[in-house]
């Protein structure tokens, strides 16, 4: 390459434009140990290549790959406001792997995308540490990702996150809701809080109520209740699949119970939910009161204490409850499947 720079003007570098290659390399080195501790035996190469290599696990007759991608929404804004970055990576993994387990798939590997205006290696390393923790909880490998430093696109060291995960399921064992029938039992698994949904409304409530984030809510500061990481249900549910026939699963994310349960129901079925069958967690009561939020809006925005819904036959319900309890869960029967009449909604919330 011929040097065409002018001796009369300063020599510009990528760093002058706001991109610090050395900081990016430093982050990669710090990430390697995180990736190493999540490594499954099927991973064929370490970090740093152009693409991650992953061998399909043995023991499948007709393996089907299942993929998903997600983010954590405006929970990120609250994380930045509170300068708490160590658990947001768990949220990112949870949002992806919990979607995969709904189809019966075991998560295999995970990749992340981290975009920022100015790379703070310390903040990014905290985020990736959380991603590694999430991958360990889900039993999948962190095999790579992308860190994009884009000055002018984001303010300062503000950042955005996206995750991508691939899982595997035996074709004959795909869970798609097609077996759901009248009389089936619906079991709820508790959430840890709002998880990663509804945070635009949460932030609005905080704003209009001039909330004190150190206020006690259910025995912990409000800031902790709102930043509690999303639960990862993967290992418990994989064990349940080996124990009995699970007909459908619904990950209760944005849209709440009313929008997510219909995604796994046949057209002729409805879910009747008894809202008195579980305890409404204090953080949701606080949000509803401070924001004067209607019941209907609560149930279509937040998980309201139910992070995952499991559909099993009535004959298997007691065994499922017992198994989940022995596994350390706190399951509760929240309703049943009934025939859908013309003009009815697929989720009926009974709030007696």
Curated annotation (Swiss-Prot):
GO terms for molecular function: ATP binding; phosphoribosylamine-glycine ligase activity; phosphoribosylformylglycinamidine cyclo-ligase activity. Its EC number is 6.3.3.1. It comes from the Bacteria. One of its GO terms (cellular component) is cytosol. Its main location: cytoplasm. It is an enzyme of class 6 (ligase). GO terms for biological process: 'de novo' IMP biosynthetic process; adenine biosynthetic process. It catalyses: 2-formamido-N(1)-(5-O-phospho-beta-D-ribosyl)acetamidine + ATP = 5-amino-1-(5-phospho-beta-D-ribosyl)imidazole + ADP + phosphate + H(+). It is found in: Cytoplasm. Pathway: Purine metabolism; IMP biosynthesis via de novo pathway; 5-amino-1-(5-phospho-D-ribosyl)imidazole from N(2)-formyl-N(1)-(5-phospho-D-ribosyl)glycinamide: step 2/2. SUPFAM superfamilies: PurM C-terminal domain-like, PurM N-terminal domain-like. Keywords: ATP-binding, Cytoplasm, Ligase, Nucleotide-binding, Purine biosynthesis. PANTHER family: TRIFUNCTIONAL PURINE BIOSYNTHETIC PROTEIN ADENOSINE-3 (PTHR10520:SF12), TRIFUNCTIONAL PURINE BIOSYNTHETIC PROTEIN ADENOSINE-3-RELATED (PTHR10520). Belongs to the AIR synthase family. This is Phosphoribosylformylglycinamidine cyclo-ligase. It comes from Teredinibacter turnerae (strain ATCC 39867 / T7901).
